[in-house]
Structure formats: structure tokens, C-alpha cells
Regions:
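Auxiliary Fe-S-binding modules of radical SAM enzymes
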Residues: 177-245
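Structural preference for beta-strand elements that scaffold enzyme active sites
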Residues: 73-77, 103-105, 126-128, 162-164, ...
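Conserved glycine-rich "GG(E/T)P / GGGxP" loop and the immediately following alpha-helix
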Residues: 66-93, 138-151, 167-182, 188
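Short glycine-enriched, charge-decorated loop/helix-capping segments at active-site entrances
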Residues: 47-51, 140-145, 218-219
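Conserved Radical SAM active-site core
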Residues: 1-126
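Conserved radical SAM core fold
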Residues: 41-44, 83-85, 110-117, 126-143, ...
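Glycine/serine-rich loop-strand microenvironments at binding/catalytic pocket rims
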Residues: 30-31, 150-167, 174
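Alpha-helical scaffolding segments of alpha/beta enzyme cores, especially the outer helices
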Residues: 60-63, 88-99, 115, 119-122, ...
């Protein structure tokens, strides 16, 4: 649990300059071999720590967020690990946060059924969703997930609340110009419930990979590659940011 700048989620176009109480737990529903948070996601250490983790109730989290309002806190962000593996807890806590007039943020990999998203929709104000790549092979065989599920989640989330996306560029996996062009074109084509295009305004964060966890067989992504892919994405998107550079 930490009081973080909102930009750290990362959210660049949602209450910039504010702070948000950020909380996480243990576990994830993907198996990314390069996981940046493997200590709390799906490593052996994560499962060992989880057995002795502190338990916090929705009421306690809501009270903590309210107490921090005098430190520019605008609400509560579920982050660090994958929050949707415990979506009922997120729902119950977010309901209390909203009742207190505060904001709720979800940082997620988007690997969830749309029924879960609809259950959370009344209580979520912003999301940063990982769009980790744009090929089914990468999602299925490297990450252990489903690109189609994530695309459906993003498309609906963009109709519900403020959405920003993050893509970690891994050398030799999702770093081609063609893939970034296809991804950004798909994002730009997203529509609201009335059929109007909204995708061009969705911010995309393109981040640099560093070797860690089970993927140490390749170097960090070159900074110039990140900047070049950002320029490609800007062909279709208005707000493109680079990270870890």
C-alpha cells in the first residue's frame, strides 16, 4: 500500500498532478515470463508470502483513502498484482470509495469476462489496461492468455470510463513496426456506445523491457526502438507516451 502520483499507474490524462492510494495483493491470471512484479504475482515467493500476508477489509481501505484526502488523495487504485482475480473485493471496496465521493482506478491485464467488467462498471472511474501485444500466438504461447478476450475487454471499458493502455515492448516478441501499426490502428477504431469514434483519444504508453524473472535471454529494449515505435503509433493515436527510457 502506498500513496503514489497518479502518473505512476500510469495515467497521464486523468486528474494529472494528483495522488492516489494504491493497493495490491498476490496472484495473477497470466504467466508472463518477464513479469515486473513476479514477487507478488505468480512466483514461488508470491505464493509463500501470500500465506502470511496482512488482511485488509474493504471498510479499512475506504477509511484509509478518506483519511488521505488532505494529502491530495483522489481515491483508490487497485494495482501491483492483477486485481480482477479478486473482483468481488474490488467491487465491494469501490462501492464504498464512490459513496465517499472519491475515485476508483483499476490497473489490469484485461483478462476477464465481460460480465465481470459490467459488474464493476458503476464503480470504476479509470483504468490502465495492458495490451501486451497484438498477435494471438504471443498471448497464447508466451503469456498464457487470450488476445481476443483482452480486445473485447478494452473495447467495452473504453465505453464505460477513462481508459489508457500500456504495451511493454519485448525484443523479438512484439517489437515489429507492422504489429505496432496494426495495434494502434485497432485502438483508433474503437467506438462509444453511440457508434462515434473515440479510439484516437485513448492514450497509449509504450514501455521498455528489462530482462528479469524467467526471461533473461535477451537485452533490454533499445531506447531508440521505443521512440521509433511511438512515432509509428502516433500515425493513429493522439496521445502516445514512452516509459522506462
Amino acid at each position: 500500500m502506498a500513496l503514489d502520483p497518479i502518473e505512476k499507474k500510469p495515467l497521464r490524462r486523468f486528474f494529472p498532478g494528483s495522488m492516489i492510494l494504491s493497493v495490491g495483493s498476490y496472484g495473477c491470471n497470466l504467466r508472463c515470463p518477464f513479469c515486473q512484479n513476479h514477487e507478488i504475482s505468480w512466483s514461488a515467493e508470491a505464493f509463500a508470502y501470500a500465506d502470511h500476508a496482512e488482511s485488509v477489509t474493504p471498510e479499512e481501505l475506504a477509511s484509509a483513502a478518506i483519511r488521505l484526502k488532505n494529502r491530495k488523495n483522489i481515491g483508490l487504485a487497485f494495482t501491483y498484482n492483477e486485481p480482477l482475480i479478486g473482483w468481488e473485493f474490488v467491487r465491494d471496496t469501490s462501492r464504498m470509495i464512490h459513496a465517499a465521493g472519491l475515485k476508483t482506478v483499476l490497473v489490469t491485464n484485461g483478462t476477464a469476462e465481460l460480465a465481470v467488467l459490467e459488474a464493476l462498471a458503476p464503480y470504476i472511474d479509470a483504468m490502465n489496461i495492458d495490451l501486451k501485444g497484438f498477435t494471438g500466438h504471443y498471448y497464447t504461447h508466451v503469456l498464457g492468455g487470450s488476445l481476443d478476450m483482452v480486445k473485447a475487454f478494452i473495447a467495452r471499458a473504453a465505453q464505460i470510463c477513462h481508459v489508457e493502455l500500456t504495451t511493454l515492448i519485448v525484443p523479438g516478441e512484439n517489437d515489429s513496426i507492422e504489429e505496432m501499426r496494426a495495434m494502434s490502428a485497432w485502438i483508433s477504431g474503437l467506438k462509444d456506445t453511440g457508434g462515434d469514434a473515440i479510439g484516437r483519444e485513448i492514450p497509449l504508453h509504450i514501455s521498455r523491457f528489462f530482462p528479469r524473472f524467467h526471461m533473461t535471454d535477451r537485452p533490454a529494449t533499445e531506447v531508440k526502438a521505443i521512440y521509433h515505435l511511438a512515432e509509428i503509433a502516433r500515425e493513429n493515436l493522439r496521445y502516445v507516451y514512452t516509459g522506462n527510457c
